[in-house]
């Protein structure tokens, strides 16, 4: 179920503080966050945010078409190694 328009987009307060500080200082260093649930706002465009995927921080460069999505969508948590090969098909 989608979030109500009346409530507006959700973004953690500590992440907003870090983004505002980075924008004010024009700092290009990645902003490290564990907040995968935060919505990407227009203020984030042009910044690199390191989103935690459970094991490490994945750097995500925010572009204009990412606005409205969640940060966690761009830092995958699972790695698919592929299915086991069928030995009969190799012959």
From Swiss-Prot:
Belongs to the universal ribosomal protein uS19 family. One of its GO terms (biological process) is ribosomal small subunit assembly. GO terms for molecular function: rRNA binding; structural constituent of ribosome. The keyword Nucleotide-binding does not apply. PROSITE patterns: RIBOSOMAL_S19. Protein S19 forms a complex with S13 that binds strongly to the 16S ribosomal RNA. InterPro entries: Ribosomal_uS19, Ribosomal_uS19_bac-type, Ribosomal_uS19_CS, Ribosomal_uS19_SF. Keywords: Ribonucleoprotein, Ribosomal protein, RNA-binding, rRNA-binding. GO terms for cellular component: cytoplasm; small ribosomal subunit. The lineage of its organism: Bacteria, Pseudomonadati, Pseudomonadota, Betaproteobacteria, Burkholderiales. Transmembrane segments: none annotated. The keyword rRNA-binding applies. This is Small ribosomal subunit protein uS19.
């Amino acid at each position: 179920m989608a979030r109500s328009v009346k409530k507006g987009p959700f973004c953690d307060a500590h992440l907003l503080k870090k983004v505002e500080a980075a924008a004010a200082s024009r700092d290009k260093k990645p902003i490290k966050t564990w907040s995968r649930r935060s919505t990407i706002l227009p203020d984030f465009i042009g910044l690199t945010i390191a989103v935690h995927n459970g094991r490490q921080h994945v750097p995500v460069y925010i572009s204009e078409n990412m606005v409205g999505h969640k940060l966690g969508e761009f830092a995958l948590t699972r790695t698919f190694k592929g299915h086991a090969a069928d030995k009969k098909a190799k012959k």
